[in-house]
């Protein structure tokens, strides 16, 4: 999914910065977000990486890794809500107590591409 999103952004003449591909130079992921936060828009990928449930419940659901959720919130703090979109692949639980956060579902119809472009246009991207 990451590669597909990268290719899509490049097709729009936007060069993505993929934090996991950048040199760490001894930085934590939060320090890398701070270092690379001079950007106009952020995209976070929520994928079925973990499984979790409320204590005492047998209703387990897929979740993005908890560090992804934290980093998503941190990125919103740096860029503001309207400059960050989360792409959700699969049946992934998303935090439901953060109002105004944009979650875009990825499915076979590839409608996510139009949704992401729409969000980027609102903040001034000519895509």
Where are these regions (language model features)?
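Conserved beta-strand termini and adjacent loop/short-helix elements that scaffold enzyme active sites
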Residues: 19-21, 87, 106
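Conserved N-terminal substructure of TIR/SEFIR domains
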Residues: 1-42, 78
């Amino acid at each position: 999914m990451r590669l597909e999103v990268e290719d899509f952004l490049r097709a729009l003449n936007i060069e993505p910065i993929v934090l996991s591909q950048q040199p760490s130079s001894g930085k934590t992921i939060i320090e890398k977000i701070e270092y690379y936060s001079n950007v106009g828009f952020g995209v976070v990928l929520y994928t079925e990486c973990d499984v979790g449930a409320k204590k005492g419940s047998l209703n387990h659901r897929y979740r993005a890794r908890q560090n992804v959720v934290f980093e998503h919130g941190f990125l919103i703090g740096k860029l503001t809500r309207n400059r960050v979109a989360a792409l959700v692949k699969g049946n992934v639980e998303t935090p439901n107590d953060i109002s105004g956060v944009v979650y875009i579902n990825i499915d076979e119809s590839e409608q996510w591409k139009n949704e992401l472009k729409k969000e980027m246009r609102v903040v001034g991207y000519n895509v």
